[in-house]
């Protein structure tokens, strides 16, 4: 329960929590099996109208280092990834007003024509923005992207699924219900996704537990989340700044997430 989660986070012994989480993992994957994916994150543009306070990545359209990736650069990055054994691409970027759905359909088709690789790409905020500037609804947008080669959605753009937090750190980004609805719609058309969380900006424990509750509830409804991935907020070079949350706090929350999200098969470590 939420109350048990809060109590154990505040008072539980970290090693005991870790052992309990490992036991939960072993029930799913006995014989000490752990899984991993080799993929590459490719950013197609750093031009973004969202301008989140925690972000050090975005640029304005006329900044000297603003870009939209060209296909030669894209294919070179994919070639490097394939040579290293990658089986998946995570293609993400800013909310660029010049990139309608046609850009992404062409991008995904060109990749699928050349490579036998999973396209795990576009976060919920990107999907909503693409739909908006292309005059489409969410379902039609996802169906068209799926037909073009999009296999699954990453969980980025969730940060913390509590609008009290979101209004402060990303006031121009979609709200909690919009993020959940994109995922629900993706699952309804047979497109799997992951769920994520960025902890440690201005959020508190009750915000994070609320976030997990929303994820678990949607998973009960659709069964469409393949994995949950969490990472810590990285202060510096952004408007929000602040302090970095401790590694022990991360491990404590990670262990409890394995116990709480009993309906999601994989808890994944972040590369970033």
Name each region found by the language model.
Residues 65, 167-173, 242-244:
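Short glycine-enriched, charge-decorated loop/helix-capping segments at active-site entrances
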Residues 1-50:
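Flexible, acidic/Gly-rich N-terminal and inter-domain linker regions that tether
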